Amino acid sequence: TLYIKDDDSRLSFLQGNFITMTNMKDKDIDKMIKYRISPVNISVHSTNPDLRVKMLNNRFAGDIESKIKRLNDAGIEMNAQIVCVPGYNDKSELERTVNDLAKYSENLGSIAVVPVGITKFRENLENLDIFDKDSSRELIGQIKRMQEHFLSEFGRRFVFASDEFYVLAELPLPEYEEYEGFSPIENGVGLIKMFE
């Protein structure tokens, strides 16, 4: 019998899905390390434990950084995703999360920042703002400043804004070489550029 749940690490390895790791116990991480399951695609959203618990509405969500550290220390390759929500994990919280994740740049290939998507199915859910032209431009500027820092520190940009931010901001996409091999393309980073 095949048994795969939505947040199953096998989907991350086999199909490129991003997982929150909220349901992973130490034994699950031990297994990933033992079998060298790599790369692992992680939906981080925030390294602030209280904020991550709130955003994911899951009391087990706060220890993401310790899990990332374990994988990094074992040499497991990872990619990170931050679904950015205005008023929650943007601005200073985004800066904090990216800087926290930069400690694991040895095995963390890239961080993709994508805007939150809102559907009409929001009954009994918290009201969320979405990115507009101005807030998208502000976020792109913030990411470009971080990229400049990481280029000088690591020799690579490390963090990328998804193409959707550029569309919302009504700005041209970055140059082809700025995507550095298009590693976070599953997150919509460089997808439009590939068709130019």
Model-predicted segments: where are they?
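Auxiliary Fe-S-binding modules of radical SAM enzymes
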Residues: 102-104, 112, 117-196
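Conserved Radical SAM active-site core
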Residues: 1-107, 118-146
